[in-house]
C-alpha cells in the first residue's frame, strides 16, 4: 500500500520549510514553491521552471497540490456568485464571491455545517459534520481564483478580500483556521493585507484569546441581541460565554490588534419585532459604550422554514438613528445574492449531520414562539 501523499495546500510557510528541510533543501526553495502555488495558481510541479528537475521529481513522489472541486455555481443578478464546493463523502460547503467597484470579496467556510445552532441562520439548521482542513479552507480561494481567471503570467489575482463568514464558527476550528489565515496573509501565500482578511465569530471567548495571540486580522463579532435573555435564544453559545464575557474578550483582542484600527465590527441581524425596537437600540448602544466598534445592521435574509421575518426599512432606519445619537458609526448592509440564497445567513450546503439537531429544533421553535407572543 503506497504512502499517502502530503497535500501542500495544508502547509503554511513554517510547515512548508520544515518539509523542505526534511528533503535536504534550503528554506528559500519552499518559498519559491509557495509562490508558484499561490501567486500563479500552479499545481503541476513540472511547470515550476525555477525549481530543479531532481527536486521536482522528489516533490511529485511525496506531495500533491489538491484543492476541493467546484460542484456547481449560481450567479445572482447583482453579480454575486455562489459556489458549491465538494469536500468528500457526498458533502458540499458554500463559498460566495461578492464583486464591488473597489474590491472583490470571497466569503469562505470553515466547517461542514455549524454546531452553534443560531436560530436565525440556515447553516445551523443543516447540522454539523466536521471541521474543514487547511487545504479545504485555502482551497476555496485557490479554486475560485482559477474559476475567475488566475493571471499566471502576471500573478494578478481576482480576489482582494477574504471574510471568514461562510459556513461554520471559525474559532471552533482554530487549529486549521490559523494556518489557513497565515497562508492568506503570507507574502508567498495569497499576500493579502491583514485589514483585508476578516474573521467573524459568535463568541467562543477562550479561542478568541488564542487567535489574538497568534494572528492580527480584522474582527467582526456577531452580537444580534442587546441582552443575555434574548441572545441566549438567538445565539445559544451565549449561555456559555455571556455578553459581558464576550465583550471583555473583544476588548482584549482590540488591544493586541492593529488590523482593526482600534475598533471591531458589530454584526446585528434585524429580525422583525424580535430585536429591532427603539428600546432595544438604546439598550444596544449602552451595551457597546465601552467597546470601540462600528455597527453593521444586517436585514434578515429569509430561508425556507425560518420562523423570523425581515425588519421593515422604517424600523431599521429608526434603530440606526438611535445608535447614531450615541455617536456610533452605523452601516446598513446592502443585501447581496439573496435571489440565489447566497446572502448572509442563507448558506446551507449539503451536510451529513452528526448532531441531534432536528430533535433540538422543536425546542428552539417553542422558545421563539414564546418570545414573539
UniProtKB/Swiss-Prot annotation:
Q: Which reaction does it catalyse?
A: adenosine(2503) in 23S rRNA + 2 reduced [2Fe-2S]-[ferredoxin] + 2 S-adenosyl-L-methionine = 2-methyladenosine(2503) in 23S rRNA + 5'-deoxyadenosine + L-methionine + 2 oxidized [2Fe-2S]-[ferredoxin] + S-adenosyl-L-homocysteine; adenosine(37) in tRNA + 2 reduced [2Fe-2S]-[ferredoxin] + 2 S-adenosyl-L-methionine = 2-methyladenosine(37) in tRNA + 5'-deoxyadenosine + L-methionine + 2 oxidized [2Fe-2S]-[ferredoxin] + S-adenosyl-L-homocysteine
State the disulfide connectivity. 107-344
A Gene Ontology molecular function term of the record: tRNA (adenine(37)-C2)-methyltransferase activity
Q: Name its cellular compartments.
A: Cytoplasm
Instruction: Name the principal localization, coarsely classed.
Output: cytoplasm
Which EC numbers does the record give? 2.1.1.192
**CDD domains (UniProt xref):** Radical_SAM (cd01335)
Q: How is the cofactor bound?
A: Binds 1 [4Fe-4S] cluster. The cluster is coordinated with 3 cysteines and an exchangeable S-adenosyl-L-methionine.
Instruction: Provide the alphabetized UniProt keywords.
Output: 4Fe-4S, Cytoplasm, Disulfide bond, Iron, Iron-sulfur, Metal-binding, Methyltransferase, rRNA processing, S-adenosyl-L-methionine, Transferase, tRNA processing
Could you list the residue ranges that cross the membrane?
Answer: none
> What SUPFAM superfamilies has UniProt attached to this entry?
Radical SAM enzymes
Q: What does this protein do, in the record's words?
A: Specifically methylates position 2 of adenine 2503 in 23S rRNA and position 2 of adenine 37 in tRNAs. m2A2503 modification seems to play a crucial role in the proofreading step occurring at the peptidyl transferase center and thus would serve to optimize ribosomal fidelity.
Query: Which HAMAP family does the record cross-reference, listed alphabetically?
Result: RNA_methyltr_RlmN
**In which family does this protein belong, per the annotation?**
Belongs to the radical SAM superfamily. RlmN family.
Write the protein's name.
Answer: Dual-specificity RNA methyltransferase RlmN
Source organism of this protein record: Shewanella sp. (strain W3-18-1)
